[in-house]
């Protein structure tokens, strides 16, 4: 994975049995994985949880979820 926190990276995740691609900046991928570990979830499980409650696009919902969780798990 790139060291540049602003680099946009595309990853494939599985939601409800369907593969989908998500583009996020490296910094968001790092934090999303940290949150998944803290919750004892796989990355797919965490993204599925976010997907269930989103009203907009998935990438945006993930970014908002991460921002809302900053500091809660430290």
Residue locations for each model-derived region?
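Amphipathic, hydrophobic secondary-structure cores in small proteins
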Residues: 14-66
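A detector of short terminal or domain-flanking linear segments
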Residues: 1-13
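Short, solvent-exposed charged binding patches
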Residues: 67-74
